[in-house]
């Protein structure tokens, strides 16, 4: 004769307090990000906008727009950095590849001109006056 307890009845709770037959984790609800078709968190973006006190009031479309812009910029940057790492036959994106991606792209370089990426290095560049002349 065994002393194990039978499984809880349908709709009951198990020992940990969770409902029986229901998986823990994400339920696949209809959050703002899912409605907008974004990966970046719209709700968190809105909370940070309000907590930052950038304005007295924040419209309901502002977090969606900001999350979309942030998602686009990070996707663009990761794509360019991934291309740079692939060109150098590496499988990992390092700060060096992020720097190469930003500085070789005209628009990103203009946008991030005042940004220093830690451990990123600089673009390789040798001035023409320092090179030896071929005629002599």
UniProtKB/Swiss-Prot annotation:
GO molecular function: DNA binding; protein heterodimerization activity; structural constituent of chromatin
Record has Ribosomal protein as a keyword: no
Start and end residues of each stretch annotated as Disordered: 1-38
Pfam family for this entry, one: Histone_H2A_C
Function comment: Core component of nucleosome. Nucleosomes wrap and compact DNA into chromatin, limiting DNA accessibility to the cellular machineries which require DNA as a template. Histones thereby play a central role in transcription regulation, DNA repair, DNA replication and chromosomal stability. DNA accessibility is regulated via a complex set of post-translational modifications of histones, also called histone code, and nucleosome remodeling.
Family under the similarity heading: Belongs to the histone H2A family.
PANTHER family: HISTONE H2A
Protein name (record): Histone H2A
Organism: Euglena gracilis
């Amino acid at each position: 004769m065994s002393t194990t307890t039978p499984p809880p009845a349908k709709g009951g709770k198990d020992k940990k307090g969770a409902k029986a037959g229901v998986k823990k984790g994400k339920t696949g609800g209809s959050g703002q990000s899912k409605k907008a078709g974004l990966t970046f968190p719209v709700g968190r973006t809105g909370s940070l906008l309000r907590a930052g006190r950038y304005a007295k009031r924040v419209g309901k479309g502002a977090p969606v727009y900001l999350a979309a812009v942030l998602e686009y910029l990070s996707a663009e940057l990761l794509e360019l950095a991934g291309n740079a790492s692939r060109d150098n036959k590496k499988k990992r994106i390092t700060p060096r590849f992020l720097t190469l991606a930003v500085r070789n792209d005209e628009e990103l370089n203009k946008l991030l001109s005042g940004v220093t990426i830690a451990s990123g290095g600089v673009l390789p560049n040798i001035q023409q006056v320092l090179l030896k002349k071929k005629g002599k």
